[in-house]
Amino acid sequence: MVDVNRFKSMQITLASPSKVRSWSYGEVKKPETINYRTLKPEREGLFDEVIFGPTKDWECACGKYKRIRYRGIVCDRCGVEVTRTKVRRERMGHIELKAPVSHIWYFKGIPSRMGLTLDMSPRALEEVIYFAAYVVIDPKDTPLEHKSIMTEREYRERLREYGYGSFVAKMGAEAIQDLLKQVDLEKEIAELKEELKTATGQKRVKAIRRLDVLDAFYKSGNKPEWMILNILPVIPPDLRPMLQLDGGRFASSDLNDLYRRVINRNNRLARLLELNAPGIIVQNEKRMLQEAVDALIDNGRRGRPITGPGSRPLKSLSHMLKGKQGRFRQNLLGKRVDFSGRSVIAVGPTLKMYQCGVPREMAIELFKPFVMREIVARDIVQNVKAAKRLVERGDERIWDILEEVIKEHPVLLNRAPTLHRLGIQAFEPVLIDGKALRLHPLVCEAYNADFDGDQMAIHVPLSEEAQAEARILMLAAEHILNPKDGKPVVTPSQDMVLGNYYLTMEEAGREGEGMVFKDRDEAVMAYRNGYVHLHSRVGIATDSLNKPWTEEQRHKVLLTTVGKILFNDIMPEGLPYLQEPNNANLTEGVPAKYFLPLGGAIKEAISNLELNPPFKKKNLGNIIAEIFKRFRTTETSALLDRMKNLGYHHSTLAGLTVGIADIPVVDDKAEIIEESHKRVEQITKQFRRGMITDDERYNAVTAEWRAAREKLEKRLIANQDPKNPIVMMMDSGARGNISNFSQLAGMRGLMAAPNGRIMELPILSNFREGLSVLEMFFSTHGARKGMTDTALKTADSGYLTRRLVDVAQDVIIREDDCGTDRGLLIRSIAEGKEMIESLEERLNGRYTKKTVKHPETGAVIIGPNELITEDKAREIVNAGVEEVTIRSVFTCNTRRGVCRHCYGINLATGDAVEVGEAVGTIAAQSIGEPGTQLTMRTFHTGGVASNTDITQGLPRVQEIFEARNPKGEAVITEVKGQVTAIEEDASTRTKKVFVKGETGEGEYVVPFTARMRVEVGGQVARGAALTEGSIQPKRLLAVRDVLSVETYLLGEVQKVYRSQGVEIGDKHIEVMVRQMIRKVRVMDPGDTDLLMGTLMDINDFTDANKDVLIAGGVPATGRPVLMGITKASLETNSFLSAASFQETTRVLTDAAIRGKKDHLLGLKENVIIGKIIPAGTGMARYRNLEPHAVNEEEYLNPPVEEEGNEETTEVVVDTAVETVEETVE
């Protein structure tokens, strides 16, 4: 076997007949499988031991040689070699076909490779191959045309006309083989290149296609005639097994049936040829053989598929590779692993952030080998076998050993669906009783887990390296920030929020108000003994609290509450005392009004202060973010645990209960509804009198009911009692929002009908009053739609993530600095007056390209190539700077990846990104994971405002990334200049917009109903939209430059996500958009050996031009191409990656003809062949480390080496298309 970690590239080519023979260990001549009596494989059959190897280790078929000492001997009685039975997974056989047969991939694929090579239509090919027509192979001296097609009847007539032997015409794959042998590649390529100089239209397109295929054959060394098979490889028997079931029946792989048909027909054909049977019978048999081989390679590609019992189509070699259940996705990209388990999860409120609870029985099974080794090491028993017995018996002594073994041995917990990297995190196991895994409540948000029956899987990292990586890189306590936006992902929720909210409440006039304490302990003791309430405002000597006070504050009394003293207890030293729930207090300290001189009038001072609101969920999030910024991970996770404990403790003490009486009543609800009824009546009257249209009536009625609901909501908010338990839950952010509250106490309002249209009849009742039967019926629409939408959305969002990952999986941070001379000019993103993403947010964590100066003073705020921190970004914006040139992924020059400076900080850690970080995958996850939160709907704008539907939510994101023509497309101008006139043409129901500029004039026809974005006299730039709507990016690329298109796409994606309240870092979208514009179409090859019209990577294109320019030639010209992510994934340089994504057969067909080499640079290719991935610690620069003292310069900029080139030998794994391996579980 080839050592996976030693080879650096993998090539796929067409297999020549001699190659297939060299693989084979013998010819399969009989269709038999195994003998029904002896259950031994039949000789020369599909499971023959002579050909494929022994069925038992180190034993020949007849039993003459047994044991390993005879290894390598071939038995003189039965002819079986004595070796491991594992060879039955790798030894191949072959079938000598009695007539040539075409390979269906090359004849049937789109475009047909055979058809292009021979310049024949696929229809004509099919007629010849399946014996329906003759093709002229050699016209000799007759006027017949070479390659012309004739029916049986025409053939006989021509023979009569010109005489026997005057020309050669044949049928079947044999004829095509002869034609393919005649193809002179060099000559044809030269002729096509000449033709391309003058050809236009369809002719040109066809010539480019033919040239592409012929050139592929020429450069790869594949011979066109190898597309016809004279010899068929038989894959190893253990990859198409037969298993005996209970009751003596057999279950066999479909491939055995398909091979059996081929062998039967081949043997029958041989017999007919021996007997000199009539031509028509032989022809029929040859056609059947062709169909049998077609079915074996790709059943169902042509005609009706061959079916097995119960008319189920048989799974052919192609089906073994395709789709989710195929070889690539089922067995190569994702395998089931040992040392894993799964169970229901339950909450573990007492756990630390880095711990998880593992049930004892589960742990003993998972850590069995470790426990057994330790038992032997302690001399409790002598050998491993006895240790195993001890463990299985459940001996008392094993539990203490288990405790020691699992100490500091992290385990991984994973919850499906794993939407982003936080879906798998490492924890230290803690043994618990029971059968459920215990999960820390704060990591639930990252996993999107809850405890209503969710299950999670647990995995054990085995090697020292794996344990180290789990502990250092994956420990849950390290994952404070969300990679998509750099905000904390572990904010407390529910009970924890409620407890801290209750703890920090302030109330006037509670017991003990105005007491003064010398220190924290005295205050807490007074509270515990009931002298002072948690919410009472009291005084405490400032210098007794260990906080960063100023000298002046140190000798005063601080006015606060006992709850806040306890709350500040858990905060790290060095953080200001938290008195008010706002950012000013958090960053600058307590305002002066809360300090009183020693001996001051405290009751009076308290009565002059307003009551502060308590700390809500959002405030807690801000505190965590600030602490992370100041103290980093360790301190933050410790604080989170303290905050969790405090929250749980005080929500228990608060003892909140909810009863129906806690839902308030709005006194004047009846009047508000009565008023609305009257107004609706007026609107209906206006409609009846013809004063307004039906659409206007509908909009006015729905607006009226909305207003009524809002009025009720406002009343509720105004009259709410801050101590009402429901209000507390809602206000703190623990559960529920104002909309839920107003459905409980106000009115439910308008509902959507199944078609998405809002129904005019609102639900006037609320849940406290109860709904009528009709109202209940109306509500069911919304509930059902919600469920179906969620189900559909989840599938759509998952597929989007899969496409995104596939297109960007090989984008890795490859170097420190690419030295680009370009940058990206950014400003805030806004839509009309609405701010979508501010400049400050966009600048944070990026590197500058140019110096940023103060617009008024000219003072330098930050130099070039410097990291913009949060504070610097704020300073830049406060100075009034509106646009900044930054380093961007768009302008990065690194090949197959990005450099550290163009990427900026890693949002998940808040530090500069490391070389080796798989930023492409992280970007894909960051965009895909919130996909489920986006809406599905296309908004219908009441039929009045405009006639276009604006696509929003998930469909719009897909539209952008697939570079589709948008719905409601905007008209753009190709001329920079002034709008001179807008004319309306009533006859065609259109408007004409005239733009005049220096380069010329433009006249644009826009629909009558479209809303204009420009007016007469206005200035427009090239590519500017004249009407409302989305711009088609491909059209924009034709008018403007690549950077403009990239910037436009970035802004559009941000608009969708931000409008739904989802924040995503720009850099993630930049990574994806850059992958969509990596290709160039060659327009004129110049002196390079590129082919006109081919699509190629921009780097390969520049390389080709560099070589020509150095030699003083004419460079090629090309045009950048924008591709959707699906197409971009299939156009990747790695055929393994593309084949495992979609259209497997098409990708492999194309790769084999080109003799493509996969250099294994991306992640997927390496996972497929089982090599460590070239990202993170798997990069060569980290794996080949030798510890020694090093100077920093050399460390940061190591000598450039091609990734993956460890000291290796080049191994060409000859993977023919015809040999498609399949493994069976």
Swiss-Prot record:
A single Gene Ontology CC term: DNA-directed RNA polymerase complex
GO biological process: DNA-templated transcription
Residues that coordinate or bind Mg(2+): D450, D452, D454
Catalytic activity: RNA(n) + a ribonucleoside 5'-triphosphate = RNA(n+1) + diphosphate
Binding positions (Zn(2+) 2): C818, C892, C899, C902
Top-level taxon of origin: Bacteria
Keyword Repressor: no
Class of enzymatic activity (EC top level): transferase
UniProt entry tagged with the keyword ATP-binding: no
UniProt entry keywords in alphabetical sequence: DNA-directed RNA polymerase, Magnesium, Metal-binding, Nucleotidyltransferase, Transcription, Transferase, Zinc
EC code(s) of this entry: 2.7.7.6
Cofactors that this protein relies on: Mg(2+); Zn(2+)
Record-level Gene Ontology MF annotations: DNA binding; DNA-directed RNA polymerase activity; magnesium ion binding; zinc ion binding
UniProt cofactor note: Binds 1 Mg(2+) ion per subunit. Binds 2 Zn(2+) ions per subunit.
Alphabetized InterPro entries for the sequence: DNA-dir_RpoC_beta_prime, DNA-dir_RpoC_beta_prime_bact, RNA_pol_asu, RNA_pol_N, RNA_pol_Rpb1_1, RNA_pol_Rpb1_3, RNA_pol_Rpb1_3_sf, RNA_pol_Rpb1_4
Positions that bind Zn(2+) 1: C60, C62, C75, C78
Function in brief: DNA-dependent RNA polymerase catalyzes the transcription of DNA into RNA using the four ribonucleoside triphosphates as substrates.
Subunit structure and binding partners: The RNAP catalytic core consists of 2 alpha, 1 beta, 1 beta' and 1 omega subunit. When a sigma factor is associated with the core the holoenzyme is formed, which can initiate transcription.
UniProt-listed NCBIfam families: rpoC_TIGR
Sequence similarity: Belongs to the RNA polymerase beta' chain family.
Name of the featured protein: DNA-directed RNA polymerase subunit beta'
